[in-house]
Amino acid sequence: MSMRSTFVLRVFAFAFAASVATYPAAAQLRPGPLPPPANAPPPVVIPAEPKPEPPPVPVPEIIKRFSENEQAMLVAHGSYVYKKVVRVEEIDDNGKPAGTFQFTTELTPLPDGRAYERELKHPETSLNVLNLEPESLSPLLKIPPLPFIPSQLVHYDVNYVGTQKLDELNTYIFRVEPKQVERQHAYFKGVIWVDDQDFVIVKTLGHWVTELGEISTDNFPFKFFDTYRENVQGKIWFPSYLRSDDSVNTKHGLVHVRLVVRWEDYKARTAAPAPAPQQ
């Protein structure tokens, strides 16, 4: 089987809880933070405040609640299907795309409860510098969609930075750094934004590191990821947008490259209810 076929037929196993509670029905989904415009400059990490004002909810309680909600949403994530659009651009000196690579997949359920990514649109490319196939983007598979569950958060130092308004959301900001890096396991290092109503993570900004450094390859130069989540149902917030800007060194100089991933059309793929996040 070709590498391309292997990618298209990659099977994902999802674990389902034997007994789960029901999410409360939501009259209206809450708008999440808006992704940046296509021509926006790369984001800058917010500097830590020397002594931020204490939040109205104790910091340990905020951390406990958002990590427990992350766990509940991770379980719920296995009962959804979605489309994924991956686009890579080479940017010219005027900030315009000079070449693109794009493909679209859909997570499709199987009768046995598993699912696979089915190719909806054949990869199209007009890139001049990068030589990409879908398999070139395999480092993306190492980035978990909902990584800050309690069992993983114990490996991090989580420090409260302050508050920030993200469009219509009021958020708490935390710096997250691994206590220790490992050779085989990647850890997040960066900043997360937590909604002050649902106590869920709505935005992350940072990179994934191992003992050997940041996750990247020659054909995947992207290291720093700006990720946004959207309110899918009730208090469920799933990733909807990821962006990374970097550069590639060529004989003609540095070439600006950009990665954008969009997750669209989240739909429940089973009638089994999902566990509700903590109130």
Locate predicted features.
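Intrinsically disordered/low-complexity terminal segments and short unstructured peptides
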Residues: S5, A18-A21, T104
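Bacterial N-terminal signal peptides
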Residues: R10-Y23
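Non-globular disordered terminal and juxtamembrane segments underlying protein topogenesis/assembly
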Residues: I192-V194
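N-terminal secretory signal peptides that target proteins for export/translocation
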Residues: M1-L9
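Structured extracytoplasmic
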Residues: Q28-F188, Q197-V202, H207-K223, N231-P239, ...
